């Protein structure tokens, strides 16, 4: 049991690649928390995909013992949070579990959009923020400019920012001292009823669900009967411990401490991030504020390329869902692609991470259908439906209006690319909210439809700014707009996997582009194939794929025209019949390429 005044809880806030995980590694290494022989890069990022992409996906934690210059021993609890917008709710929970943040900014790059988003969350959580300028060993480092930028853009005093090189270990001692001296100690009442915040949870094959908790008030011991206040589920605690970063069992956790519990919990879905844990008997009356259930935002279909792998895919998806409560799925069948699953994700990075993990860890090749967002459909009889898949769109005559999700996008961009960025946002039906300058960079805030962003907005943004723009977004709600379902018909048969929701003004342009693309991608058959884009019964674009022609008159010698005509008529009749009964094979690449719409 540690005295409250000797505990410091903190997180590290940074943009991707600004050195957050490397700084965490150095703090762990320099305090001797991990033996040198056990040390490895990105120690807290357990998944291969986290290391490979250089991102943190789950909130990880480590308890560090540190003897400060004043001779006292302190316990430092670091929660290493995800930096990406898709995992923003995980970040906000982790922020509420600690009292301070280290704001890590790359001294060669300056402040980026995700830095901003996460700093604002830290400010919302009333954090004491210590700026850290990283990568000072690089020749391009310009600490004074970046410190000025932190003051201009974020409004935090950066005169005493710590200058470090996480790679070489310069400034690590100063960072540890700043954590002890400048960050506040936690508060809490040992004798009050137990209140513990559920920060994260994951599944372990031997222990069941492991729950990461921050104790706010009270004491949690092995053998206690606990209750989750959101779900009312009750469990007996069978193990309590802390991470150093390996698990170490302890007898109890008191106020201000961060650790883990196991309680024979079978499913991650039973433990909701942000929930309050209390004692079953004599528990707390009120839960901790700020709980929100996680809601999937982007949906898409996952289908195995080889239909015999469907059962393996089901197995893989069920195992991933054990560990990720924000990932939802249900079975779906498609005339074009066979059996698969309709899955819900927090955003595009979440979708990519899950898809990569299925392909890598379970060795299943996947086809991913067009990502779509959740639309609200208001029927004329007053009923409201949620539409996850454009193919399920009800009859338009019964629909009163549709609403689509909107986001607030913050884009930081060097001012020479500003015109291109504004044009891209206008093309995507954006409404400009704000434009400000910090040094030579512009900060643009746009209200955009999420539907226009989920596809390839990020790739387009990177290409028009040569990779210099950084982008971050938050959901802001739903708004009505003139949206229609565009179907694609190949040989007069609708292809459900290519149905998309588009704005009526852009439907013709989108439909024409889709038809032209499919014409190039579908191989020619023995009969001609019409490719059409339609809204309801009205065709808005059409391309015709011409037939392969066999020269049936090659054997005719001499000049008998009637013989030739007879053979050509017979061929024509055969092609007509073939077109009636023939099946058009659409290759897998056609689905993937047709959905990547280049404006």
Curated annotation (Swiss-Prot):
Record-stated family: Belongs to the TRAFAC class translation factor GTPase superfamily. Classic translation factor GTPase family. LepA subfamily.
GO-annotated molecular function: GTP binding; GTPase activity; guanosine tetraphosphate binding; ribosome binding; translation elongation factor activity
Domain of life, per lineage: Bacteria
Entry keyword set: Cell inner membrane, Cell membrane, GTP-binding, Hydrolase, Membrane, Nucleotide-binding, Protein biosynthesis
Binding site for GTP: 17-22, 134-137
Record carries keyword Cell inner membrane: yes
Location(s), subcellular: Cell inner membrane
SUPFAM superfamilies: EF-G C-terminal domain-like, P-loop containing nucleoside triphosphate hydrolases
Lipoprotein listed as a keyword: no
Protein name: Elongation factor 4
Parts of the chain that traverse the membrane: none
E.C. number: 3.6.5.n1
Topology relative to the membrane: Peripheral membrane protein
InterPro entries hit by this protein: EF-4, EFG_III/V, EFG_V-like, EFTu-like_2, G_TR_CS, LepA_C_sf, LepA_CTD, LepA_IV
Cellular component GO terms, alphabetical: plasma membrane
GO BP: positive regulation of translation
């Amino acid at each position: 049991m540690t005295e409250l005044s000797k505990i410091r809880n903190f997180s590290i806030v940074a943009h991707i690649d600004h050195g957050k995980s490397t700084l965490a590694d150095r703090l762990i290494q320099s305090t001797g928390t991990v033996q040198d022989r056990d040390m490895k890069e990105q120690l807290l990022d357990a998944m291969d995909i986290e290391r490979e992409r250089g991102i943190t996906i789950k909130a990880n934690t480590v308890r560090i013992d540190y003897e400060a210059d004043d001779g006292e021993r302190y316990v430092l609890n670091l929660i290493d949070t995800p930096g990406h917008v898709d995992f923003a709710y995980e970040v906000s929970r982790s922020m509420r579990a600690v009292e301070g943040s280290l704001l890590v900014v790359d001294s060669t790059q300056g402040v980026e959009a995700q830095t901003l988003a996460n700093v604002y969350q830290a400010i919302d959580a009333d954090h004491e923020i210590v700026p850290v300028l990283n990568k000072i060993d690089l020749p391009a480092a310009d600490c004074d400019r970046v410190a000025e930028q932190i003051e201009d853009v974020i409004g935090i005093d950066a005169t005493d920012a710590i200058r470090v090189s996480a790679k070489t270990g310069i400034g690590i001692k100063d960072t540890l001292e700043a954590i002890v001296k400048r960050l506040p100690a936690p508060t809490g009442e040992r004798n009050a009823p137990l209140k513990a915040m559920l920060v994260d949870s994951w599944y372990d094959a031997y222990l069941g669900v492991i729950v990461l908790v921050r104790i706010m008030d009270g004491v949690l011991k092995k053998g206690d009967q606990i209750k989750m206040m959101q779900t009312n589920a009750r469990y007996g605690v069978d193990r309590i411990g802390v991470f150093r970063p390996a698990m170490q069992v302890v007898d109890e956790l008191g106020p201000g401490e961060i650790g883990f519990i196991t309680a024979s919990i079978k499913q991650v879905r039973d433990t909701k991030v942000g929930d309050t844990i209390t004692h079953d008997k004599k528990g707390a009356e009120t839960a901790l504020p700020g709980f929100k259930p996680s809601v999937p935002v982007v949906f898409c279909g996952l289908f195995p390329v080889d239909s015999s792998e469907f059962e393996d895919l089901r197995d893989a998806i069920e195992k991933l869902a054990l560990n990720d409560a924000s990932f939802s799925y249900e079975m779906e069948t498609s005339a074009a692609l066979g059996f698969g699953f309709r899955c819900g994700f927090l955003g595009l990075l979440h979708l990519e991470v899950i898809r990569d993990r299925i392909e890598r860890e379970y060795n299943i090749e996947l086809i991913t259908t067009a990502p779509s967002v959740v639309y609200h459909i208001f029927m004329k009889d007053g009923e409201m439906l949620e539409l996850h898949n454009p193919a399920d769109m009800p009859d338009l005559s019964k629909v009163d209006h549709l609403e689509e999700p909107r986001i607030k996008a913050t884009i930081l961009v060097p001012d020479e690319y500003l015109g291109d960025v504004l044009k891209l946002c206008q093309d995507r039906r954006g409404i400009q909210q704000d434009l400000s300058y910090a040094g030579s960079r512009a900060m643009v805030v746009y209200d955009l439809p999420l539907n226009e962003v989920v596809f390839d907005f990020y790739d387009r943004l990177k290409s028009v700014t040569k990779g210099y723009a950084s982008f971050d977004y938050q959901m802001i709600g739903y708004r009505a707009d003139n949206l229609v379902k565009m179907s694609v018909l190949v040989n007069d048969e609708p292809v459900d996997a290519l149905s998309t929701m588009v704005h009526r003004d852009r439907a013709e342009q989108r439909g024409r582009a889709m038809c032209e693309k499919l014409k190039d991608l579908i191989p020619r058959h023995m009969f001609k194939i019409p490719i059409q884009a339609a809204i309801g019964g009205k065709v808005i674009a059409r391309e015709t794929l011409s037939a392969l022609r066999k020269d049936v008159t090659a054997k005719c010698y001499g000049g008998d025209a009637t013989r030739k005509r007879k053979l050509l008529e017979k061929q024509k009749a055969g092609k007509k019949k073939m077109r009636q009964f023939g099946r058009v094979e659409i290759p897998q690449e056609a689905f993937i390429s047709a959905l990547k719409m280049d404006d």
